Amino acid sequence: MIWILLVIYQLKHFIADYPLQGRYMLGKFKPWPDFVLPLLSHGLVHGVFTFAIAAFFKPLSVALALGLLDMSIHSVVDWIKANPSIGGRFAALSKNEMKSILSYVPTLGETEVKSKFGDQLRSNTFFWWALGADQLAHHLTHYLLIWMILS
């Protein structure tokens, strides 16, 4: 049963973090207080999925508690990743963002932009570490939830 739940939680994580995370939920990267509702709505999607999964194994009150736990942990982890003074300071720039910077500062060439904003480019090691730490925290949360469901 543990292997089935591991696969279910991988699918849950993918569906909730990618196809179901719409433009509104990406508002979690906005400054205070505008990020709060988008972040909580994204966490709620994770909580609803966990509630639905846990309801097959546990009483509804326990399933609800597990859903709220998942929502809370997911929201905090994503807040840490998105917060500009914590993980968000390592945000990576896409090619379009790079073009946007070049359009605002037309006197700079690509080399100058890279030297000024190099710590924010996709080659930024810390961006990938922050993203990896975020995913690790989510997976460890899933292991905890699976353990709680099966206990």
Model-derived segments and spans:
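Hydrophobic alpha-helical transmembrane segments
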Residues: M1-S151
